[in-house]
């Protein structure tokens, strides 16, 4: 296949492992073949391990991380350590960017409202949670089922478990979205806000 003497051996396409030398080996009948049998591979391994540096190389290969399974187990170990962190995406109508927020850092809806005000610079979020009928923006969230609900409709612990992402909508869009505050919501948020 490759032209001898033209230096095309490097670019030659062939079947086999990369950088593998095809050494012709004579079998018992004197025929030449390009495959190495298992005993030859084992003999080569024994020769390397009998030399002084071979034992260190075996240990080095043993400690070396290769392949995807160790990476997955590494990620699992790190996710166990960060189980208390629960990041959700937060978007605001009119803002050209999304943010991530850790819900685990907040103790309740009032802390969340202050953080949203600070994050997006839209003041009045705390008042919007306390007085649901007034305010320019309304914070809503998507739960596990994919339903959009008003922030504050459920107790804080249930909100923490079910929230997938947050969105700050304009009030007119939220009414068109079909989100109406519950009658008992106002008292609940006032008690949480104190």
From Swiss-Prot:
Aux/IAA proteins are short-lived transcriptional factors that function as repressors of early auxin response genes at low auxin concentrations. Repression is thought to result from the interaction with auxin response factors (ARFs), proteins that bind to the auxin-responsive promoter element (AuxRE). Formation of heterodimers with ARF proteins may alter their ability to modulate early auxin response genes expression. Its main location: nucleus. Gene3D superfamilies: Phosphatidylinositol 3-kinase Catalytic Subunit, Chain A, domain 1. Belongs to the Aux/IAA family. The gene is AUX22A. It comes from Vigna radiata var. radiata. The keyword Repressor applies. Homodimers and heterodimers. This is Auxin-induced protein 22A.
């Amino acid at each position: 296949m490759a032209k001898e003497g033209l230096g095309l051996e490097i670019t030659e396409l062939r079947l086999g492992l990369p950088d593998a030398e095809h050494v012709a080996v004579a079998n018992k009948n004197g025929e030449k073949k390009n495959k190495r049998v298992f005993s030859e591979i084992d003999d080569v391994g024994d020769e390397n391990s009998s030399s002084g540096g071979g034992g260190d190389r075996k240990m080095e290969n043993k400690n070396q991380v290769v392949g995807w399974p160790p990476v997955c187990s590494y990620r699992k170990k790190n996710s166990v350590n960060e189980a208390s962190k629960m990041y959700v995406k937060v978007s605001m109508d009119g803002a050209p960017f999304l943010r991530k927020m850790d819900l685990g850092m907040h103790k309740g809806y009032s802390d969340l409202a202050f953080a949203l005000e600070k994050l997006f610079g839209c003041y009045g979020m705390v008042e919007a949670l306390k007085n649901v009928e007034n305010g320019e923006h309304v914070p809503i969230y998507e739960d596990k089922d994919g339903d959009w609900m008003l922030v504050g409709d459920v107790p804080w612990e249930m909100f923490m478990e079910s929230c997938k992402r947050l969105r700050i909508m304009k009030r007119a869009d939220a009414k068109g979205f079909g989100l109406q505050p519950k009658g008992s919501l106002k008292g609940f948020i006032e008690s949480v806000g104190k």
